[in-house]
Amino acid sequence: MEFFVISLLNGLSYGLLLFLLSSGLTLIFSMMGVLNFAHASFYMLGAYVAYSIARWIGFWPGLVIAPLVVGVLGALFERICLRRVHRYGNVPELLITFGLAYLVLELVQLVWGRIAVEFKPPAMLLGPAFTLLHSPADGLSLVLGAAPAGLCDAAAGAARVLCSPFPATRAFMMFVAVLMLAVLWLLLTRTRIGLVIQSALTHPQMVEALGHDVPRVLMLVFGVGCALAGLAGVIGGSTFVTEPAMAAALGPVVFVVVVVGGMGSLAGAFLASLLIGVIQTFAVAVDASLLGLVEALGLAPGPQLAGNSLLQLKLSQVAPILPYLFLVLMLIFRPKGLLGTREG
């Protein structure tokens, strides 16, 4: 039972990190119609900027300052570069953001090097947020923080206690992602600037006639989307690894989340992030194969069948391709995504 609970929480935390990153891309696409190919590069940039700040004044100032720096850089890119090609359609926008992704990668390698940097979370996030205890006598219980010393090292037998800690970094990741979801929802539905942003999407001429600067609103949207990616980078970089390959590792999965959830749908991105995070985490955690399934059904595979390399593939080995399989199935059976309204 504790394996299921911890795996589920790990999947939810990974899914919420995906949402924190994909929410910025979804916001940019829904408001501007721009599919930012360099979005994961802002994620990487947030991690590296926070790493540099944390070395001088600590992690918590870096958590606040790095997303702001990345957001300003994103807004400047929209103002100086993206706005100039916007009138020519989607292909020039894709090409210029594609070029930006490689430019950011090369700059990161020039400034911080080609190997991973040691970006650690603060001391208060290094231990477990809580520990699940499972004993034959008391069943499943929960202890905040680490388990009492010596409890998990009890002798084998009836007194043995299984301890499954859940890292505080992942709990913090979940908290920040849910907080950002609430802030985005309140901003877009309960504030004046949110109403202006949504109106600028559907009736830009009317909004401009009312005295609002539509290009500045769109620049703000792009900057906020990049800042969300930077915030995800601070948390993801300190929790996992901060290296030049982190954008390439997570970027394709983020595009899968946006398409599966529905282009431009924040609710769809949230649902798709959780689904992909949980499915991929359980696939990595479960040690199973088609051959094992055949044997579990009581069938006796012959020597030729037992030696088949395809049947011997573990579920954990195919876990990295599951999001893309999900994407293909979604495009075949529901092209507009889970909660999307656009077919293409």
Name each region found by the language model:
Residues E2-L17, L184-R192, L218-G264, T281-G292, ...:
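Inter-helical junctions in multi-pass inner-membrane proteins, predominant
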Residues L9, M31-L76, I80, V85, ...:
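Membrane-embedded helix boundary and interhelical linker motif in transport proteins
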Residues R84-V85, E93-R190, V286-P320, K336, ...:
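Transmembrane helix-bundle core of multi-pass membrane transporters
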